[in-house]
Amino acid sequence: MLAAKNILNRSSLSSSFRIATRLQSTKVQGSVIGIDLGTTNSAVAIMEGKVPKIIENAEGSRTTPSVVAFTKEGERLVGIPAKRQAVVNPENTLFATKRLIGRRFEDAEVQRDIKQVPYKIVKHSNGDAWVEARGQTYSPAQIGGFVLNKMKETAEAYLGKPVKNAVVTVPAYFNDSQRQATKDAGQIVGLNVLRVVNEPTAAALAYGLEKSDSKVVAVFDLGGGTFDISILDIDNGVFEVKSTNGDTHLGGEDFDIYLLREIVSRFKTETGIDLENDRMAIQRIREAAEKAKIELSSTVSTEINLPFITADASGPKHINMKFSRAQFETLTAPLVKRTVDPVKKALKDAGLSTSDISEVLLVGGMSRMPKVVETVKSLFGKDPSKAVNPDEAVAIGAAVQGAVLSGEVTDVLLLDVTPLSLGIETLGGVFTRLIPRNTTIPTKKSQIFSTAAAGQTSVEIRVFQGERELVRDNKLIGNFTLAGIPPAPKGVPQIEVTFDIDADGIINVSARDKATNKDSSITVAGSSGLSENEIEQMVNDAEKFKSQDEARKQAIETANKADQLANDTENSLKEFEGKVDKAEAQKVRDQITSLKELVARVQGGEEVNAEELKTKTEELQTSSMKLFEQLYKNDSNNNNNNNGNNAESGETKQ
């Protein structure tokens, strides 16, 4: 469970365990941005009137890699600069950490990831999976917070004013711990997360905006780390989710890993060298695998060339391999197959057949893979729609929901569902459901339980999420104790357990003895999540990096201006070649080269002294002005001389 503040009402024998107490007010002031916090890439959007707009980042891209790196100088890089230096700094470059969010270290998925990433995944004191870089540990929510902050800064740069409110998306199949950890990520960087929206639902919002006809739409969302399938009924601005299903550990990262393993295996067969423990080599192969995967969506074959990947006594070794689309599809067939069952379950839960589906939307970068498109067509019996951009639809939908919450958009109603059944443990370790999966939220449900033994004065309420019949096979999301029950025969006390799920899909559970108004005590034991103190510490840490981040931002802006000056000066030199002093022109060319080298380092994510950059820019500006002033003077003198000569010749003729 998440560490939470628990309020005890002493006027009645009741106790309440809020798995998520840190709910934010939905009172909105200012702009509400929509953020798609993705496993591989993230995006941010805003509504401009009735039109949603994706905002480009400082590097000019519409999506930002969800990558955070820590340099040896202590600088934190986020996005493109972080991804660029991953090969030379693999142990301290954190990517795909969304897969760890809200997870326990012992989870099977986490144990698999430990073997597949170059950075360290460690066990936190509360049993959660955390990551380590440069000797410092971070929660996955904290890393997500750094990416959210980058999105926040991107929006602020575009809007020209501070942004406080956001709608953030999560995979539809995220459980309570993962949803709350996502809200924590926003809180860490000072974002008021007004709503957590399911990714496929957000994509449907992007698709259905301004559409008045009635449709049943399936959203097939295969992203970088997660897979979701949602069935929605869209009717004149009302978006009702009928069912959802998925796999929170299936996505593009897995396709990369399959190809990476194949490359490492082939290389070992060819050379006898095992690259498994060479982190720098593995990172190079990982990046090449990702690039090859993307290329194979539009071409039938690709080549992977990695010179000097390693060396032995006989000399340097290189990777030079060809992969056809057919080979890649055969290799990753088990991954594509894993999308089939969730689709069938979602249709069954919605009480629909494939013929009832009007359109199928493809969302997420992996949905571009031809084999995935073919599988979707086979499942639904129709070609999927290309009405939305797979990379941008989720962020756009989040912005639409933000505009709904701020009152800018009034003709949209979103009715989402809880993805997993919720219940408590009863006698014998049985999972007793109170709220079945795919129940429309917000919702509230109560049920009466009693004691399992005579004279029992307290009961432990253990809260689980899942679909199995025994609690041991489901996810424990919280537990608390209701104490002070008067001794009575077994089965006599009446204990009312209430589940209350808000619009974010976050859960409040309470227990009350209906027979007495005596005082009680409460004991809460957390299963996972960040405590308030930990969040506060992370907020402080984020502030520490603020000045560094600002310096980095200024360096990028200065570099962009310097690059513009260098290009303009270079073009002018070409235009007036032969008219300016050769020695002076060469001096300016040397300054241009020097400045461009510095700019390239900044754009490559390196730490560069801002003063040095500023000085070199000013020096080039001064030199170029002097040079072109001289050119202007020379031109003026030549014109004067010509005029004088013309005047003299005129007098002679007279």
UniProtKB/Swiss-Prot annotation:
Chief location category: mitochondrion
Group of enzyme by EC: hydrolase
Enzyme nomenclature, EC number: 3.6.4.10
Annotated TM spans: none
Biased composition (Low complexity): 637-646
UniProt GO molecular function: ATP binding; ATP hydrolysis activity; ATP-dependent protein folding chaperone; enzyme regulator activity; heat shock protein binding; mitochondrial protein-transporting ATPase activity; protein folding chaperone; unfolded protein binding
Transit sequence range: 1-23
Any one GO biological process: chaperone cofactor-dependent protein refolding
Residues where Phosphothreonine is found: T330
Family: Belongs to the heat shock protein 70 family.
NCBIfam families (alphabetical): PRK00290.1 (NF001413), prok_dnaK (TIGR02350)
Quaternary assembly: Component of the PAM complex, at least composed of SSC1 (mtHsp70), MGE1, TIM44, PAM16/TIM16, PAM17 and PAM18/TIM14. In the complex, SSC1 interacts directly with PAM18 and TIM44. Interacts with NAP1.
Protein name as annotated: Import motor subunit, mitochondrial
Organism: Saccharomyces cerevisiae (strain ATCC 204508 / S288c)
